Every structure is written in C-alpha cells, then in structure tokens.
Amino acid sequence: MTAERVDVSTAQEMWRAGDTVIDVRSPSEYAQGHIAGALNVPLDTLPLGARKLPDRPILTTCGMGGRAGRAAELLDLAGRTAFYIAGGTKAWAAAGLPVVVGPEPDGSRDKHLWFRRHRSHQA
C-alpha cells in the first residue's frame, strides 16, 4: 500500500468530518502556525505513537508536505489509513483555512507531551 496525497479541498472535507489531523513538525515549528485542532506528533515519535492514535483515517501535515508524506507512509506500513496534504500547512493557510499560532487551546499540547512521555518509557 502507498499513502495517498490529498489536495487542500479534500483535506478540508476530512478535517470537517472529524478525521485525525497530525502535524509532524517539531514543537517550535508547530507553534509558529498549524491547522486548527491538529495534534503535534513529531515525525521521530510517530512509530511508537501510531498505536495510540484514534481509529479513524489520519491526515498528516508539515510545513510543505515532505515530512507529512513520510509520516503517512509510516502509518500506512503500520496498517493505518493515512493521507497527507499536498503543500502541507503552507497550502492550507494559503487557502484561507483555520490556522492557530501557539499551542492549541484545547489541550493538544498536552497530547504532544503524552507522546513524548510515551516514547521515553518505550526506550
């Protein structure tokens, strides 16, 4: 299987449907601007964290799409249904879709910290 690239319009439909969106950039990159509601799961934490993501399709993003493509491939290899946004968060923002600067107000930062703790306990 190969992870599928989706355009911003399709990504928006998935986002509205409640599919899980993960931003695989570093926490500092994530804080500079990310898709509203996206979980911050840096690429290097993804293999261990994949088991704990909700059982729904997963949409990955990064700055421009490169790391998101790798993340979607990893998720696909782990048996998950994964897609990545062509052009990443940059394309999402250029389309005028919701972007948050700083940590997510709904606790997504806490979810990121959970992934970091989970990874350190697995090492």
Language model: regions and residue ranges:
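Rhodanese-like catalytic fold shared by cysteine-dependent sulfurtransferases
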Residues: 1-20, 27-57, 64-123
